């Protein structure tokens, strides 16, 4: 990997990326309300479970396959699989989350003129666009390797979940850093599993997350949009 590719992925994984990731907890806040999360240890376990049981089977392998489709510029497959992913979101909140963040990232890519003209034209035709599809486009535009792309995406997800824990549990900064350090190995394992997953084995089934997300829509007190 070149320094330019590394910097591009650091940019994409940065919480400063203006796509609104900070406003979502992806069920974390609802799990806290249901007393599934109570302290730093249970927060770490919840985030680890989301990484290994949800992302590693669904979002990460989907991202890897969308990355390959952007490299091949297979517009039909990109649109078809993007529609499948959006439809697989199990609550209105989770669907709005991926659509809003995907749209914001796609707009950023267009404004910064990332990628060639033909692929940018294809990007503009995919609506609503899921976050992994837009992230794959941005990564492909910088010609980053699949393992590094998935690692950046997974780390960004872990960091955002940890940030939600700091605000909602609440936890201290050191406790948050301990969670991130503890999950480094799990990120590597999740990436390796995702890269070994064929397209027909991508699995986004996560009933507990779907139920918690649906409950969050009517939760009395909320900090986050999901």
UniProtKB/Swiss-Prot annotation:
Alphabetically ordered keywords of this record: Chaperone, Cytoplasm, Nickel insertion
Subcellular location: Cytoplasm
GO cellular component, one term: cytoplasm
Molecular function as annotated in GO: nickel cation binding
Presence of keyword Cytoplasm: yes
The keyword Chaperone appears for this protein: yes
Domain of life: Bacteria
Subunit structure as annotated in this protein's UniProt entry: UreD, UreF and UreG form a complex that acts as a GTP-hydrolysis-dependent molecular chaperone, activating the urease apoprotein by helping to assemble the nickel containing metallocenter of UreC. The UreE protein probably delivers the nickel.
Task of the protein: Required for maturation of urease via the functional incorporation of the urease nickel metallocenter.
Database matches in PANTHER family: UREASE ACCESSORY PROTEIN F
Protein's recorded name: Urease accessory protein UreF
Organism, scientific name: Burkholderia ambifaria (strain ATCC BAA-244 / DSM 16087 / CCUG 44356 / LMG 19182 / AMMD) (Burkholderia cepacia (strain AMMD))
Gene that produces this protein: ureF
